[in-house]
Amino acid sequence: SIDTIINRQYAIANNQADSIDLPKQRIYAMCNLRGGIGKTTLSFNLSYLVDNLLAVDTCPQGNLSFFYDNNYYAAQQTNVKDMLLPYLVPGLGKATRVASYIGATNPYFSKKNNYYIPSSEELYLLPSQLITAINQTAGLQQVQKEQALKSILYSLKTEIERELAENNLDKCIIDTSPFFAGATQLAWYAADALVIPVRTDQQSIKSLELLI
């Protein structure tokens, strides 16, 4: 209930809260179906606190990418949409070593071995492309259909695992957008756990209930 969240927030603000012993995971997705709740801010702050980390920006607004490189949109570098497209459009070659070293464009990260995969404005098109790719599996035999769907739905996870291995990284944070379709859906398949930022107001609680 909202009272539980308010009481927890009050205890934290007054240094009276005990830490919660949560299981440690490898890939986290920052999720909430409400905008302006702090997903990107929390993703950025956590990426600064943790070393050997991969940050993946799946929000088409690209705010997290901007925090790492305020000129990323003009850099013409391979982005998360480019990385996912070969799983949706047959015949395209798969990318490799997509992630960029954050310290190269943000000096505050120069002492950390952290990388990021930038966003793309074209992620707004991903939901329809994802649905089209899924619909194309309808005519396949059951085994083939299951293999094709698994390849599509776990495409982001496959690419994250590859980037983690290629860059010798330990953890991953995925920043998501406030809508579920497209890259956020793939982020849920990729993640070992969801981190859900919640403010202590009724609208935020409603959004949490909707997400769950």
Model regions and ranges:
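P-loop NTP-binding core
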Residues: 1-212
